């Protein structure tokens, strides 16, 4: 039986729970209920990725990190910097909540879904990823799951790194964390990344004119943070980061008109917070401001030509969260306030708009004998659609020591985005999209194998669809998603294995047709070992059958895209205790495949990098 100690101060002795790169059950996570708790006490499937994992995989983008995780489908209109989408457990890309240090990502242009091709991998120190509904804790968007990207660095020191690769890829990065006295810590980072890219082609999506050019990507990033401990219990921080990106892409072109095929994104975020960390009570107050300007233009005419577009959004956030240890668990409560302001012209909306949301929530976690109970409830008051309530509950039963059954149910929702509300085809009377989800799971530790098998169902109603007859958006769609997820990690001698299998049947509940761009089956496998001081890693991904639309002629036709097996090989060697060199071959067998119909992937790519720490 799990030891009857506080779930926030002692860790379970069993190897529960979710598939993760950091496989220790004592790993602390903050995303499940906003405060640190051992991962073994989180009943929802949870994955943790550390900076060490990212360096070992030699990932050059956030999408490359996320594609390795259970339940995740990544689609992208080509290579680095091109438009991308995240699908979790078959839900829409807009049904994934992305947080940066616990604060909702400012979605440039109010599109309603996160494009993480633009977020710099240099900022990512840790990723916490939770599958399933979480609107009862975070509000809108958290239907499929939550991805929390954490930028806080844990280890002091300085690192200088550089990398080069295929398609003229180059990356230079400098970061440092220094202690100023006993109570103050400063972190600084600068990063530059550039690739010439390749011609993504975009067959059928660019009009009648071919665009045989390289579609490259350039990103420049700055980051700074100051943390101070006032006492053993009280601490505060100020943090800011910004990035300046340029992306070339293939766009629709008509002869005689400008070719809008360049994107320029400016983004900056500033956070400040005060935390109290007592023995029984924890509290934090965080304020955040972010501002994004997203230009699309013809470089021959510039960003300020009449043919260019500008999506500009400012986001203001205040979060007050509290947690108290009670019995063998805890109770949490808090308030979120958010205001989003858009400039005229954003998302093709003539006027600028403000949207405000205030949410109050209550969470609870308690262990009673062999049972663990978790629950949450939340009420959101939105300036557009009024009040909306969500709730969720889970129970875990350790029926044999080291083996647990988990059952959960939750509701969640997605608020309509700016274009759906106020655009040329908008409908200001739209309601939120709603979801009801059930999940059952078994997990345990058998002969050194840490495993979990779960089945789930997700019914989504009031989906916002475009009506071709009325030329308006309406709440008229429904989706039914059923799936099975199996994960395991184990060691065999010097070899470390991490494997996952996903089966997802995601369908339009009205027409019974498959939802587009979701693989019905996926297999993901990571093998790591060390030999003669060389650290080796092999990554395998099977991406199953998917469906998409062919936009080359009207009416648009549904096309079937076959499955593909992809292999990556990575190796690292510590030349000295300070200097490490790394090399990687992605798509080892040069497979030709697409995740979005008509947009080519890069094929085989090579990277070589080195880092020096002191």
From Swiss-Prot:
Primary localization: membrane
Protein localization: Cell outer membrane
InterPro entries: B12_transptr_BtuB, Plug_dom, Plug_dom_sf, TonB-dep_rcpt-like, TonB-dep_rcpt_b-brl, TonB_box_CS, TonB_rcpt_b-brl_sf, TonB_rcpt_CS
Domain TBDR plug: 38-152
Domain TBDR beta-barrel: 155-614
Transmembrane segments: 158-165, 169-178, 184-195, 217-227, 232-248, 263-277, 279-296, 309-325, 328-337, 353-369, 371-381, 385-400, 403-417, 434-443, 449-458, 473-490, 494-509, 517-529, 535-550, 558-572, 585-596, 602-614
Gene Ontology MF term list: ABC-type vitamin B12 transporter activity; metal ion binding; porin activity
Binding site for cyanocob(III)alamin: 83, 85, 92, 110-111, 251, 309, 517, 551
GO BP, sorted A to Z: monoatomic ion transport
Keywords: Calcium, Cell outer membrane, Ion transport, Membrane, Metal-binding, Porin, Signal, TonB box, Transmembrane, Transmembrane beta strand, Transport
Chain location of the short sequence motif TonB box per the record: 26-33
PROSITE patterns for the chain: TONB_DEPENDENT_REC_1, TONB_DEPENDENT_REC_2, TONB_DEPENDENT_REC_3
Binding residues annotated for Ca(2+) 1, in chain numbering: 199, 211, 213, 215, 250
Domain of life: Bacteria
GO cellular component, one term: cell outer membrane
Motif (TonB C-terminal box): 597-614
Signal peptide: 1-20
Record: residues binding Ca(2+) 2: 213, 215, 249-250, 261
Membrane topology value: Multi-pass membrane protein
Purpose of the protein: Involved in the active translocation of vitamin B12 (cyanocobalamin) across the outer membrane to the periplasmic space. It derives its energy for transport by interacting with the trans-periplasmic membrane protein TonB.
PANTHER family per record: COLICIN I RECEPTOR-RELATED, TONB-DEPENDENT OUTER MEMBRANE RECEPTOR
Family (UniProt): Belongs to the TonB-dependent receptor family. BtuB (TC 1.B.14.3.1) subfamily.
Protein name: Vitamin B12 transporter BtuB
Gene name of the record: btuB
């Amino acid at each position: 039986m799990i030891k009857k100690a506080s779930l926030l101060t002692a860790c379970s002795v069993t190897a529960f729970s979710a598939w993760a790169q950091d496989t220790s059950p004592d790993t602390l996570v903050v995303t499940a209920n906003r405060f640190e708790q051992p991962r073994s006490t989180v009943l929802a499937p949870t994955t943790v990725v550390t900076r060490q994992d990212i360096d070992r995989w030699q990932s050059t983008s956030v999408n490359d990190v996320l594609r390795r995780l259970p339940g995740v489908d990544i689609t992208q209109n080509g290579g680095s910097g091109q438009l991308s989408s995240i699908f979790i457990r078959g839900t829409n890309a807009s049904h994934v909540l992305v947080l940066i240090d616990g604060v909702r990502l400012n979605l440039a242009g109010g599109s309603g879904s996160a494009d993480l091709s633009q977020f710099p991998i240099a900022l990512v120190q840790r990723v916490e990823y939770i599958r399933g509904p979480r609107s009862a804790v975070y509000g809108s968007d958290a239907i499929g799951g939550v991805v929390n990207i954490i930028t806080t660095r844990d280890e002091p020191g300085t690192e200088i790194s550089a990398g080069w690769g295929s398609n003229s890829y180059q990356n230079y990065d400098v970061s440092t964390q220094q202690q100023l006295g006993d109570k103050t810590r400063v972190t600084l980072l600068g990063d530059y990344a550039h690739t010439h890219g390749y011609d993504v082609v975009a067959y059928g999506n660019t009009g009648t004119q071919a665009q045989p050019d390289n579609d490259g990507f350039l990103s420049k990033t700055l980051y700074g943070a100051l943390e101070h401990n006032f006492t053993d219990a009280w601490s505060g921080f100020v943090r800011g980061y910004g990035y300046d990106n340029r992306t070339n892409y293939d766009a629709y072109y008509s002869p005689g008109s400008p070719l809008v095929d360049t994107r320029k994104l400016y983004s900056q975020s500033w956070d400040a917070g005060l935390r109290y960390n007592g023995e029984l009570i924890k509290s934090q107050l965080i304020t955040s401001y972010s501002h994004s300007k997203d230009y699309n233009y013809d470089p021959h005419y510039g960003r300020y030509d009449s043919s260019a577009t500008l999506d500009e959004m400012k986001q203001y956030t205040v979060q007050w969260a509290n947690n108290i240890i009670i019995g063998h668990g805890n109770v949490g409560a808090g308030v979120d306030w958010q205001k989003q302001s858009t400039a005229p012209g954003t998302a093709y909306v003539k006027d600028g708009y403000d949207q405000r949301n205030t949410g109050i929530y209550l969470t609870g976690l308690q262990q009673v004998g062999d049972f663990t109970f978790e629950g949450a409830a939340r009420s959101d008051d939105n300036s557009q659609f009024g009040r909306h309530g969500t709730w969720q509950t889970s129970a875990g039963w350790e029926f044999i020591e080291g083996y647990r059954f988990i059952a959960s149910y939750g509701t969640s929702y997605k608020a309509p985005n700016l274009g759906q509300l106020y655009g040329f085809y908008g409908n200001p009377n739209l309601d939120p999209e709603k979801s009801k989800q059930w999940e059952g799971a078994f997990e345990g530790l058998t002969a050194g194998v840490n495993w979990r098998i779960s089945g789930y169902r997700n019914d989504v109603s009031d989906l916002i669809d475009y009506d071709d007859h009325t030329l308006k958006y309406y709440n008229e769609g429904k989706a039914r998603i059923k799936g099975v997820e199996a994960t395991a990690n184990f060691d065999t001698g010097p070899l470390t294995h991490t494997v996952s299998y996903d089966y997802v049947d995601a369908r339009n509940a009205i027409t019974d047709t498959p939802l587009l761009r979701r693989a019905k089956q996926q297999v993901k496998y990571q093998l790591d070992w060390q030999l003669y001081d060389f650290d080796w890693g092999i990554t395998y991904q099977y991406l199953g059958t998917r469906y998409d639309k062919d936009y080359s002629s009207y009416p648009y036709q549904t096309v079937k895209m076959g499955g593909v097996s992809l292999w990556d090989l990575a190796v690292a060697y510590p030349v000295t205790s300070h200097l490490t060199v790394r090399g990687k071959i992605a798509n080892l067998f040069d497979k030709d495949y697409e995740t979005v119909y008509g947009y080519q992937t890069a094929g085989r790519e090579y990277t070589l990098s080195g880092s020096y720490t002191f």
